[in-house]
Curated annotation (Swiss-Prot):
<keyword id="KW-0456">Lyase</keyword>
<dbReference type="InterPro" id="IPR010084">
    <property type="entry name" value="FabZ"/>
</dbReference>
<keyword id="KW-0441">Lipid A biosynthesis</keyword>
<keyword id="KW-0443">Lipid metabolism</keyword>
<comment type="function">
    <text>Involved in unsaturated fatty acids biosynthesis. Catalyzes the dehydration of short chain beta-hydroxyacyl-ACPs and long chain saturated and unsaturated beta-hydroxyacyl-ACPs.</text>
</comment>
<dbReference type="Pfam" id="PF07977">
    <property type="entry name" value="FabA"/>
</dbReference>
<dbReference type="GO" id="GO:0019171">
    <property type="term" value="F:(3R)-hydroxyacyl-[acyl-carrier-protein] dehydratase activity"/>
</dbReference>
<dbReference type="GO" id="GO:0016020">
    <property type="term" value="C:membrane"/>
</dbReference>
<protein>
    <recommendedName>
        <fullName>3-hydroxyacyl-[acyl-carrier-protein] dehydratase FabZ</fullName>
        <ecNumber>4.2.1.59</ecNumber>
    </recommendedName>
</protein>
<dbReference type="GO" id="GO:0006633">
    <property type="term" value="P:fatty acid biosynthetic process"/>
</dbReference>
<feature type="active site">
    <location>
        <position position="49"/>
    </location>
</feature>
<dbReference type="InterPro" id="IPR029069">
    <property type="entry name" value="HotDog_dom_sf"/>
</dbReference>
<keyword id="KW-0444">Lipid biosynthesis</keyword>
<comment type="similarity">
    <text>Belongs to the thioester dehydratase family. FabZ subfamily.</text>
</comment>
<dbReference type="InterPro" id="IPR013114">
    <property type="entry name" value="FabA_FabZ"/>
</dbReference>
<dbReference type="GO" id="GO:0009245">
    <property type="term" value="P:lipid A biosynthetic process"/>
</dbReference>
<dbReference type="GO" id="GO:0005737">
    <property type="term" value="C:cytoplasm"/>
</dbReference>
Length: 145
């Protein structure tokens, strides 16, 4: 099931310049998801990171992993319109390859555990089949107040 940017924006609240998933390529509800982010030099982080050698910040790769997981949660639950998804913990984040403008990040997340409103994930970012980043993280789903 392909999910385009319009539906992604219906599923998660992020917007430019902080929307870091362009398309979902595969989704297996309650299990895993694969999406992409096309990295372009026009993104605001590259004006300062770094002006003469643009490099995608590691924290934004982690954020992209969290966003793809939030899309998986929203689709698995049927909707998160009346809920907020909060990142609770990031574990073992590792960065293994530079990501730069022109690259396409393939962002994969797997649900490791889900208990009531707490979800645990393993996630990776690859570029051209090469591991760029990996992390485990925990998120909480709460009713909007």
């Amino acid at each position: 099931m392909i999910i385009d940017i319009t539906e992604i924006m219906d599923l998660i609240p992020h917007r430019y310049p902080f929307l870091l998933v362009d398309r979902v390529l595969e989704i297996d509800l309650n299990k895993s998801i694969l999406g992409i982010k096309n990295v372009t030099v026009n993104e605001p982080q590259f004006t300062g990171h770094f002006p003469t050698r643009p490099v995608m910040p590691g924290v934004l790769m982690v954020e992209a992993m969290a966003q793809i997981a939030a899309i998986l949660v929203a689709k698995s639950l049927g909707s998160t319109k009346n809920k907020d998804v909060f990142l609770m913990a990031i574990e073992n984040a590792k960065f293994r390859r530079i990501v730069q403008p022109g690259d396409t990040m393939h962002i994969h997340a797997v649900i490791d555990q889900q208990r009531t409103n707490v979800w645990k994930f393993s996630s990776t970012v690859t570029v051209e089949g090469e591991m760029a980043a990996e992390s485990k993280f925990t998120a909480m789903i709460k009713d909007k107040s």
